Structure formats: C-alpha cells, structure tokens
C-alpha cells in the first residue's frame, strides 16, 4: 500500500515515535484485514506490535481476526489473549478480544479457560461483545435502544452555552452532523 511505502522510508519514520509508528502499522494491518489480505495483515500486525507494544492494540485485534479467518487458530489465540492482558486497552476492545479468546479456547477443547474469557468479555456491559458474552453465559440481557429523556432544564442550559443557539439552528435545518 502507499501508506506502507511511506512508513518503510527511514526519512519519514524518523519523525515518528515508536508509539505512532505502531499505531500507523496497526491501521495498515487492519486495512489489510478488511480487504481480505490476511497474510499481510498478520505480518503487519506483528510488526506493529514489535514497534508499538502496548500502543498497537488495533494490531493485536487485526492480527487475531486475520489469523482466525485464515484458520491459524493458535496464532489467533496468541493475539487475542495478549490483547486481553494489554495494559491500557479500552474496555470495549478488551471485551471483544476476550470473546474471541473464548472462541479459540472453546475450539481447542479448553472449556474452563473458555468460560474464563467469556466471563471477562461479559464484564463490559455496554459493548456488543459484552452483551453476546452475557447471553452465552445464560445471563439476562436487557438491551434498550431508547434515547434518554431530555428535561427542559437541560435544553435551557444548552441554549445558554456558547454555540447553543447555533446548534439548535443547525438541527432545525437538518444539519445534525455540524450541530
């Protein structure tokens, strides 16, 4: 890819921290995964992790999914388990990684370990994988897509804020993205 060519150039890399390079390589690995180029996704994910360490969480994720899709289940498990244990990873991503680590362990016949990862995934109640994990564990899942009610005091408060009137005007003309 063009992005990878830019990163391969040492003159460009000298301006990046290791964390930034790891993040960029993680994005490239994810793009390779999205476009179904699993071998390159795995290779670039490994490179991202080697350079960016804990700043390459997307690399672990992309590498794990690409490895799973290409039937490299042990490798997928390494990526997902490492992501679960990664310091500073977002709760949603940890939940997702734990769910996929559960699938790897279940496929390998490790039921007890599978349940451990499923339990970790279920701890993030406000995520897709958390909801799926809770359902798989037999817990009641109450999903609601209702928007919270807005009280008149909130609307008055918002209107009094800098830019509040502009926001309401943009909403009235249907320009919700700019609002």
Where are the regions that the model predicts?
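Extracytoplasmic and endomembrane cell-envelope/extracellular-matrix remodeling and assembly machinery
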Residues: 1-179
